[in-house]
């Protein structure tokens, strides 16, 4: 079991403990994987299998924006990354963005201190060493965790972000795809009036026709981001087939809602 403590203004740690200990009601044997003295842990971990030893590595992110890759065999830290001045409650997303056999990491970061954010960053890290391979600042609101899927079946995943913009006095939402190979950004469906605060899209093949379906939510209210006037749910079928390697990260907590990335990687050379 992987779990975190703390929060926006309360320091905490991220732990691992045996399920059997939890069932016995005693988690005193918990192992500390990482600690943040200032802001604790809200986002769930993501895990990905190490191609060298078959052990699952663990990607965790504190609310203070500190991202750590932990060796699942001995719980040592492999690398860390932190962009100064940012926070995040978005789950790290795993995909094959750089084309080697080590899964990479996609982040959504909020610039500033809650509740007064002034920018949002979309960041892709090389899974081997945590180095920044891509960073952008799309939109005026982006709290939702990302997705990863290979839309053009070239062996590399695109990053999918649900981003809010502000134009002509009202808010609108776009689901946008970042192609890290060609360095291009496209909008996957029409621009929708309204706001998506923190709902991660679903990427799946609902009708089993071999084409990718995109399902996402947008609030009715286009003037107040926190308004409670209801939501619209949209389904859009893309002109993209299910990729040979399968969908990398199709929903919040991944394809099976367990935080695990299980796509088999093959070299892109």
Locate predicted features.
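Short glycine/acidic-enriched loop and turn motifs that connect beta-strands
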Residues: 6-10, 65, 110-116, 164-169, ...
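Acidic/hydrophobic-patterned starts of short beta strands in beta-sheet-rich repeat architectures
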Residues: 1-4, 52-61, 99-109, 153-163, ...
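Conserved positions at the start
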Residues: 41-42, 55, 88-89, 102, ...
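Aromatic (tryptophan-biased) beta-strands that constitute blades/sheets of beta-rich domains
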Residues: 20-38, 76-84, 126, 131-138, ...
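Loop/turn-rich, solvent-exposed surfaces of beta-rich toroidal or solenoidal domains
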Residues: 140-177, 195-203
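A detector of repeated loop/turn-to-beta-strand junctions in beta-rich toroidal repeat architectures
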Residues: 11-13, 55, 64, 117-121, ...
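Beta-propeller blade termini
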Residues: 43-51, 90-98, 143-152, 199-206
């Amino acid at each position: 079991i992987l779990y975190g403590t703390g929060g926006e203004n309360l320091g905490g740690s991220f732990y691992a403990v045996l399920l059997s200990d939890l069932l016995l009601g005693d988690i005193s044997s918990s192992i500390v994987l990482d600690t943040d003295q200032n802001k604790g842990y809200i986002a769930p971990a993501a895990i990905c299998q190490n191609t060298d030893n078959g052990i699952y590595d663990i990607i965790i992110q504190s609310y203070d924006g500190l991202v750590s890759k932990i060796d699942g065999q001995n719980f040592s830290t492999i690398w860390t990354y932190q962009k100064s001045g940012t926070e995040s409650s978005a789950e790290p997303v795993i995909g094959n963005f750089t084309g080697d056999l080590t899964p990479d990491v996609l982040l959504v970061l909020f610039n500033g201190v809650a509740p007064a954010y002034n920018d949002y960053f979309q960041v892709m890290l090389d899974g081997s060493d945590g180095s920044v391979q891509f960073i952008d600042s799309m939109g005026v609101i982006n709290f939702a965790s990302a997705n990863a899927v290979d839309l053009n079946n070239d062996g590399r995943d695109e990053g999918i972000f649900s981003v809010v913009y502000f134009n002509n006095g009202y808010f609108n939402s776009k689901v946008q795809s970042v192609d890290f190979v060609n360095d291009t950004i496209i909008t996957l469906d029409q621009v929708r009036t309204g706001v998506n605060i923190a709902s991660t899209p679903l990427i799946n093949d609902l009708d089993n026709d071999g084409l990718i379906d995109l399902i996402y939510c947008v609030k009715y209210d286009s003037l107040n981001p926190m308004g409670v006037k209801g939501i619209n749910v949209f389904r859009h079928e893309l002109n993209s087939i299910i990729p040979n390697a399968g969908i990398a990260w199709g929903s919040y907590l991944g394809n099976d809602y367990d935080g695990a990335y299980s796509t088999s990687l093959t070299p892109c050379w």
